[in-house]
């Protein structure tokens, strides 16, 4: 998953002055704690839906611990690569590197160690396939998505791939294969990200422009393509969200809830596309952060045994 602006979530760590931050807060900023938590949530749902029979809680724990290490390492290394650009944006200038609370060498060592240990952990304790998917996620996030942010507006669409792969990792950890259910979860998280990040990019387009990031709202100041991307991907999401029911992973309660949530999310995207204001971008963003956890909760609640 790509970074979520801290100041538009409740109780943001970055709202506190750098001088007042303790090392726990510094660590939380470095590993992008909220983003890592979301990664773990999608991974956990993938594992739960993929698992058959009595739950293996030990394996679940190992999967989550290893995934947390990989996600934390990816977050730290991403900040290392973007430290000069983070310093130019108000919402990121208080991160550990641009604020001077950590040195690049420290972050490099920490991030590399976490990512490497996490991938080895997955391979040895979970399974090799999950480790491979984790490695693809890490490399695509750091060396494809991250540099593309300064090259093309398509970075958001391309970045949705590593952002959605943790859901597939959960499935592979449970089943040991790349089955239809895993790809369905991947597609849901991938399509969900586009309107979510279009709303964020619209709200922060001036900061992105100042930092040199070519987000779609930066290169499309009128917002026509931004609105179309939001609506088209929300429509696609509404369709793919039916897949867990079609593949007999979730039941009719999930189906009904997915339709209601999807229509609500689509409504917010359409309203945003019709009038690209800050207020409607915020509504779309809020709809997105409600949609995904509620949809995942419905999957868990109405899993077909």
Predicted regions and their residues:
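Cytosolic, membrane-interface loops and tails of multi-pass inner-membrane proteins
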Residues: 5-22, 81-102, 198-226
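The first (N-terminal) embedded transmembrane alpha-helix
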Residues: 32-49, 161
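Membrane-embedded alpha-helical segments that form the functional core of polytopic membrane enzymes
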Residues: 41-83, 91, 115, 132-143, ...
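Transmembrane alpha-helical segments that form the membrane-embedded catalytic/substrate-channel core
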Residues: 69-76, 139-147, 188-205, 238, ...
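Intramembrane alpha-helical segments
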Residues: 104-174
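Interfacial loop-to-transmembrane junctions
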Residues: 225, 266-294
């Amino acid at each position: 998953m790509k970074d979520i602006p801290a100041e538009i979530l409740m109780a943001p760590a970055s709202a506190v002055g750098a001088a007042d931050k303790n090392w726990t807060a510094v660590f939380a900023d470095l590993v992008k704690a909220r983003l890592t938590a979301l990664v773990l949530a999608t991974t956990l749902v993938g594992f739960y839906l993929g698992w058959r029979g009595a739950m293996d809680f030990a394996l679940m724990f190992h999967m989550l611990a290893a995934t947390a290490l990989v996600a934390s390492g990816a977050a730290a290394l991403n900040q290392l690569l973007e430290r000069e650009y983070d310093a130019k944006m108000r919402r990121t200038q208080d991160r550990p590197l641009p604020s001077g609370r950590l040195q690049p060498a420290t972050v490099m060592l920490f991030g590399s160690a976490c990512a490497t240990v996490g991938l080895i952990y997955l391979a040895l304790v979970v399974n090799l396939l999950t480790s491979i998917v984790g490695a693809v996620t890490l490399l695509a996030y750091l060396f494809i998505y991250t540099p593309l942010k300064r090259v093309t507006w398509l970075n958001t669409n391309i970045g949705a791939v590593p952002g959605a792969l943790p859901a597939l990792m959960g499935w592979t950890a449970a089943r040991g294969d790349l089955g239809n259910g895993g790809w369905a979860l991947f597609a849901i998280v991938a399509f969900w990200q586009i309107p979510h990040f279009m709303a964020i990019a619209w709200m922060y387009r001036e900061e992105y422009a100042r930092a040199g990031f070519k987000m779609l709202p930066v290169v499309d100041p009128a917002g026509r393509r931004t609105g179309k991307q939001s609506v088209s991907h929300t429509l696609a999401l509404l369709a793919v969200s039916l897949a867990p029911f079609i593949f007999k992973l979730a039941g009719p309660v999930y189906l009904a809830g997915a339709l209601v949530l999807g229509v609500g999310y689509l409504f917010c995207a359409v309203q945003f596309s019709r009038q690209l204001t800050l207020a409607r971008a915020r509504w779309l963003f809020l709809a997105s952060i409600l949609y995904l956890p509620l949809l995942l909760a419905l999957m868990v609640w109405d899993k077909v045994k």
